[in-house]
Amino acid sequence: AEDHATCVVVQPDGKILVGGYSLCSEGNCFTLLRFLDDGTLDPDFGEGGIVITEYAGGYTLEAKVMALQDDGKILLAGGGAGGFAAVRYRANGTVDVEFGTDGLATCAFSAGSDRANGIALLDDGKIILSGYSANNEIDSIAVTRFTNDGIIDESFGSGGRVCAAIPGRRTIGQALAMG
């Protein structure tokens, strides 16, 4: 198996979440682990401390960022050939199927590869993802906004999306800061 850890968050209770992606049967899938403060896997989270989330149809998921919502739910985001992707988990590691479609919220910018590398949670519960969209060797900074339910917020940008490219430059969004 091929596994990649790409992000870490410490929960208020001291438990450590590590997100990333693994090679699964139909491509890459989101992987989430939770460790107790002594470094052992949390047996009360997922299956023995590990959650692997794979969606049918070959939707490749490479997690890059993670955030904790005020209610304890966990957002793991990244993307791939199908666009930006975010999966929301309950505090026990089960997928929150009320988010997006069966727990998965997506936003495609182009026919190419789109990846979210930044995440921010707004006070009103909305979720902002930033990263890049690569199509025909033109890379653009890409930003989208979802509602707290995992639906693209059509009031943001053009149809919930914003893209910006610097002519003659490879433009990739790597982080997101809110203030």
Task: Please provide the spans of the model-predicted regions.
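A sequence-level/structural motif corresponding to short, flexible coil/turn segments enriched
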Residues: 1-179
